[in-house]
Amino acid sequence: MQRKILSVAAAVIFAVTATVTVYAESAEKLCYLENTDKSGIGVSAVSAILIEADTGTVLFSKNEKEHRQIASTTKIMTALLTLEAGEPDKEFEVDPTAIKVEGTSMGLREGDIVTRRALCYGMLLPSGNDAANASAVNISGSKSAFAVLMNKRAEEIGMTDTNFVTPSGLDADGQYSCAYDLALLTREAMNNKD
């Protein structure tokens, strides 16, 4: 259990200006320990949440419902939907319009043949905006249509303080989430066996 708590703490520290967290067996609402605000834990992030992985018990929280820009943590939802779309190992050619991106990329080029699984690696490891966009266009036909799917899935998970606009997380008007919702999302993603 201590190892899981340390893993969760590392994820929070790594991902947070907006925040992140762990998994559990279901995406039920999180339960809070008493006095989480008096834990004595010092965190420099504006928003943070630490959850025990198996139970979903909130061990620490700070401004966990405050809306924040969520940047590349958006790609957790994009990867989840990519894997849930099925056929993770089926090959396809990337749409050339999807791979012209700002910021980080996995290095996709016009004519590249990829799988959805490879795109998940590309969006989660080097934080490839091209991978996120290529997946979105492959699944939904456009980034905006994919954002509709992202918001529908967020609602199913119980993410009530989240709105997705882009699959990559590049700042866009109206795109935000909170530490609490990102914890729900991460718990859901960790349950995906692919």
List where the protein language model places each region.
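Active-site-adjacent loops and short helices of periplasmic peptidoglycan-processing enzymes
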Residues: 24-180, 187-193
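Sec-dependent N-terminal signal peptides of Gram-positive bacterial secreted proteins and lipoproteins
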Residues: 2-24
